Amino acid sequence: MISLIFDKSNSFNPQLCVELLNHFKVVMLTKTIVVDYPSFQAWKAQLKPFKLAVFSDNLQTELTPNSKLTVFNNYQQLLVDNNDLIIFATPTLVQLFDNEIDQLIVINPTSKSKDQFNCNWNDFVLIKQTNFKNHQVGYFDKKSSYEPPFTVVTDHFFGNLTDLFSLLVDKKVSVNDVDIGLISLQYLNIIANYTNKKAIEKITDYLVITSKILAKKADNLLNDHQEESVLEYDLATNNFRDKMIANLVEHKRYCDSLGEFEKLRVNRLAYFSKANEMEQFIKTANDQLVTVEDQLPNYISVLKLFHAMNKLLEMRLSSLLTNKNITIKELSVEQVQKELVLAIKQFNYQTVSLKRVLLKLNHPISLMYFVTAFVALLVLLNNQVIGLEQKDYHSELYIFLLDENQLKTFQESPDEMVKRIQAQQQQNELIIAKNKQLRAIKNKQKRADYLKKKYGENYLDKTNLKDENNN
């Protein structure tokens, strides 16, 4: 998302700049701030903690690009490398990014703002007005019939709902500071303004994410009550016991609702997808033995990695944001490699799960992207750019960037090679047998549900009938 902060005077005084940076500090730390060269010179001290992109026609030699500073004179190149920008509007930058703006944040909006800021105001809709310090702020989102904008606006956050959820997962924002009621009202406003067939996909995605935040907050509040049990316990009236029971019932209701929303969303997607397309992809390596002759460096098993990716895909099936509109998109393995490495670098060479790395990406994860990411991981592993940690077939994938000190080359003896291959074959046979067993249980349960639906809840299958006769 490209957000442009616009002051009614079309310029920022130093005091206003400091107030803005303090007010939106949490969300600005996750984005790239774009300023022109004069603004950078004036606000250099205040902008130091943030990732910056400085526009300069002459590419001033005193500016040394580094991990936190980019110097550019071509805005198109900047957009290729950055998807999330916050632009401090000056006349030069407004002219550059006029057609690329997704969101306007107007300081002290007035009826004359439209005359002072030269853009097509008919393309934007006012989402909310809020206050901070001595200023009013108006949030305007670009209208779109394909992807309705859901910009969450709270006291200390503005941005996409997916960005807020990512910050909550990384614990950069406390779930106790999130006003669920405020987010729900903004969600209802989105439904009221974008009720059409093209927008229903995004609206259901937002519902699932909002439900996850709600369940996370309910779980957190439940833990807080448990810590205060000693103080609130009242033996005579059992006030604490009654309160805990009410909280548990409410928490279960939130969790059940989340599962139901995800189930309904997946069922709706099934009407627009090919039959068993997803299941066929997942079962590819589970129904038959796959022989892999060549191993990755350090004898990492390709089959082991493939099975772990399948398990991750099954868990993320309900949250994959699949666009059903027919579009042509270029997606290369090299591009995905670059995005994965940049996401891993944000964890400072620490070992991190693949699930958290995917949450760091700046766009929704589609099925096509997920499959391409698997190929990109194979290439990165083969080139020894990243390392992989995984205990067994069922454990989660953990990856990290390799440096020269971590690069190791193992040389197996013939006996060790035979033992490793035999162990891999045994693991492979065990996992296939277990998958067949789980599939049989699943088919049996599916048949029982069908018969109960057809003949009523009182229907008893053969197993239950034997139990009844024995009793």
UniProtKB/Swiss-Prot annotation:
CC annotations in GO: cytoplasm
Protein name: Segregation and condensation protein A
Family: Belongs to the ScpA family.
InterPro entries per record: ScpA
Keyword match Transport: no
Key words, A-Z: Cell cycle, Cell division, Chromosome partition, Cytoplasm
Residues annotated as transmembrane: none
Function of the molecule: Participates in chromosomal partition during cell division. May act via the formation of a condensin-like complex containing Smc and ScpB that pull DNA away from mid-cell into both cell halves.
Annotated compartments: Cytoplasm
Assembly, per entry: Component of a cohesin-like complex composed of ScpA, ScpB and the Smc homodimer, in which ScpA and ScpB bind to the head domain of Smc. The presence of the three proteins is required for the association of the complex with DNA.
Pfam short name (any one): SMC_ScpA
Disulfide bonds: none
Region called ScpA, residue ranges: 143-471
Major location (coarse): cytoplasm
Keyword ATP-binding: no
Biological processes per GO annotation: cell division; chromosome segregation
Native organism: Mycoplasma genitalium (strain ATCC 33530 / DSM 19775 / NCTC 10195 / G37)
